[in-house]
Swiss-Prot record:
Participates actively in the response to hyperosmotic and heat shock by preventing the aggregation of stress-denatured proteins, in association with DnaK and GrpE. It is the nucleotide exchange factor for DnaK and may function as a thermosensor. Unfolded proteins bind initially to DnaJ; upon interaction with the DnaJ-bound protein, DnaK hydrolyzes its bound ATP, resulting in the formation of a stable complex. GrpE releases ADP from DnaK; ATP binding to DnaK triggers the release of the substrate protein, thus completing the reaction cycle. One of its GO terms (biological process) is protein folding. It comes from Acidithiobacillus ferrooxidans (strain ATCC 23270 / DSM 14882 / CIP 104768 / NCIMB 8455) (Ferrobacillus ferrooxidans (strain ATCC 23270)). GO terms for cellular component: cytosol. Keywords: Chaperone, Cytoplasm, Stress response. Its main location: cytoplasm. Belongs to the GrpE family. PROSITE patterns: GRPE (PS01071). It is found in: Cytoplasm. The keyword Chaperone applies. One of its GO terms (molecular function) is protein-folding chaperone binding. Residues 1-20 are annotated as: Disordered. This is Protein GrpE.
Amino acid sequence: MNEEKEESPSTEAEGAGAEVVNWEERAETYRNDYLRALADIENLRKRHEKQVEDARNYAVDRFARELLPVVDSLELALASPVEGAESIALLRQGLENTLTLFAKALGKAGIAPIEMGEGRFDPHLHQAIAMVETEGEANRVLAVHQKGYVMHDRLLRPSMVSVSKAPKAAQ
């Protein structure tokens, strides 16, 4: 008198079928979650590319706005008539003011002229375009032919300089 119920094969098959359906539903849910995650990643990638492109395109926006007064000043100078010594003096003063505006705009962008310091030749900051024999110490900057510039800690352009060298007899 064993009262244990044995499941019939059809009941087992129904249970297995229900379990298969359950697993299929779970697999479909995981697949949909996976596809959604892939779409999110693709959207994130596209958004990042757009931000990088915008940053590249508009990075100089602030700098360009700083240069507009310089352009205005130059246009004003070109539009004014130049007659006589007084006009030339005013034009020179206007050019000096424009150069000051320009230097301020460059400074706000982190661009600065290379300072000569103690006048020693530095191959990282200077490009020697002439060597001149002198009685003094060798490898000294004698003249700057074109200013060099740095942007923060990066060299934009080296200074073009003449450098001293020892006389031939002393070599």
